[in-house]
Amino acid sequence: MKRLLFILLSFLAAYPLAAQQVMERREALAAGQRVLLNLRPADHIRVRAGREGEVSFKATVSINQNKLNEAFVLQVSRAGEELQVSTDLDKEKLRAAAPGDGDCPGGQGRYYGESWTSGGDGDGHHQQGVCVAIDYDVALPPGTALRVSTWSGNISIAGLTGAIEAKTLSGDVNLSWPPARSAELALKTISGEVYADPAVALLNRRDHPIVGYEVRGTWGGGGGPAVRLESISGNVFFRQQR
């Protein structure tokens, strides 16, 4: 038995498991500059208050059991007074996906690329399922104006006091807001639910709406920064920060 265990361990050592890819960036941010996060593929996006004058960004990536992590693309740029961080997946590299070989068991993952019909994408190539797990952790100065969007990930924001616009197609949006900081609110979902702290003064509440709509309200008497949270099919939460 000991000899068998030794052989097994030796075999595993000879073929190490691929590790998750971790990408980290730090960027200087001057006072008054805005931040745009366009994080298309995502599972969870966590944004928290950090140090003044700096944005820290971390992405933890696993694509097809870490065999296609090189398909993850990160771009950082500046446009006027805005720092822009964008992520995507390289379509050409995704064509190397091999669910039949166990990279994405059952081929049940999502396909990220052009539209396709009958198993082929817009360029006539056969599409393959891609198993993607990507988490982001972002820290920025508390008063920074932020725009963040994603295809299907959950967005969680806490500790910020500047204007916020957060949108996801099918995930949840969860914002914890400081109790002493006033805000103008717009909370919207089409097929999910909007949950707002009882202290929010709702301006256009509807009872038993047939379809989703934009709920508008104020926090702390209003007059503060604009806060817009939106999900197409997920839930939207506005909470008082504890």
Feature roles, as predicted:
Residues 30-32, 40-42, 50-54, 69-73, ...:
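Extracytoplasmic
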Residues 33-35, 43, 136, 144-146, ...:
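The right-handed parallel beta-helix/beta-solenoid scaffold, focusing on the short coil/turn
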